[in-house]
Structures are given as structure tokens and as C-alpha cells.
Amino acid sequence: MASSRSVVLRVLVAVAVVAAAGAPRLAVADSPPLQDICVADLRAATAVDGFPCKPTASVVSDDFFCDAIVQAPSTSNPFGVNSTRATVSAFPGLNTLGLSITRTDLAPGGLNPPHSHPRASELVLVLSGEVMVGFTTAANRLFSKVVREKELFVVPRGLQHFQLNVGAGNASFVAMFDSQSPGLVTPTFALFATQPAMPMEVLAKTFLMGEDEVGAIKSKFAGF
């Protein structure tokens, strides 16, 4: 009887191993493309996994080219930062490829405020200047580093992170994402610049402030 149970146990273990080996893996980025090219038809409605493909006969070489990040955007704003995004909307050839890129410029002391990308990890390549890049984990631990020209820093998917110009002059970097639509969530705006407005009581209790103090903060984000 013991021998019989041992055989059954070995069979069950073998079945479990085979099943685990053949089980589908959880996707950690955009779904892989099912054809060589699928240039976005920007006139069509967006689908869950990207834009529909434009007819192959209508595809041209320029669909796979983009110069959106060549020029430095103006950084004349309270944060001293501006970004130019080369996502699928501006770069149709990215459709279904699971890629996008952003150029960000920072004035001296400029800050790209804490934010997250819920659908992508981010690889930062500094083009010029000195940029402190940092992210926080779910355990409230901060990882940060001053990144200089041609150096890289990676931010894991979905984590809050920031970029601060700590150099004497302007700074610029590109951020590469493993999604054609990484998404952007900035907590400051998500709390103080929502439409309709976040209830005052929620903000006052969250930040242990009086409503007059919350109102003063909200007034700074009017128009964002």
C-alpha cells in the first residue's frame, strides 16, 4: 500500500511540474505584436491594446520616423520643467511595439514633480547637465542618484519618482518606456487639481491641515 501511495505521489508531482511548465506567464509589458507592422490609424478610435492598423498599402517610411523630441520645449513655468512625448499619437509606427520615449528639459533648479507610470518601467538617459533621479517603494524607501551626461537610471514600473536639476545650468534627459502608453499619475494634481474638486474634508484630514491651509495649496494649482 505504501509503495502504491508513493507511485501516486510521484505521478502527481510530475503532473504538477508539467502543468507549471506549460502555464502561461503573466504579461509584464504590452502584448507582443502579431504581425510585422501595425502603423496606427489615428483616425480610428483607440482600442484596449492600441490603435487599429492602417492599411498596409497606405504605410510610408515616415510612419516609422519622428522628430518630436529634437527641439527643447520651454521650461518657463513654476516647476521649471517641460516634456515632449513621442508616444503612438505622435509616432504611429510605435503602435503595438510596446515602446515610447519622452524628452524632458529642466531649468536650473527645475523639478519634474513626483509621479508614476502605471503601465511602464522607465529608463532615464541624461543628455546634458546633472539630474537627481529618485523613486520610492511601497515600503517608503527612497532610492536616488545624481545622474550625469550619458549615464542611466532605471525606475521600476508604477513607482513614484522624480527628476530634479541639481546642476548649475539647464539639464535634459530622455525617458524610455516599455509601453506605447505608459500613463501618467501626478499625486499633486490628482489631489489638488481634480475635476470635480476633491472634498475639502478628505484633503484636510489626509494632510492634518486646516481647511484654510488646504485652500491656500489648492489655489496654487488653479489652471493646471
UniProtKB/Swiss-Prot annotation:
Family annotation (SMART domains): Cupin_1
Glycosylation sites: 82, 170
Disulfide bonds: 38-53
Entry GO MF terms: manganese ion binding
Function: May play a role in plant defense. Probably has no oxalate oxidase activity even if the active site is conserved.
Entry protein name: Germin-like protein 1-2
Gene3D superfamilies tied to this protein: Jelly Rolls
Classification of source organism: Eukaryota, Viridiplantae, Streptophyta, Embryophyta, Tracheophyta
Transmembrane annotation, as ranges: none
Cited InterPro entries: Cupin_1, Germin, Germin_Mn-BS, RmlC-like_jellyroll, RmlC_Cupin_sf
One GO cellular component term noted in the UniProt record for this chain: apoplast
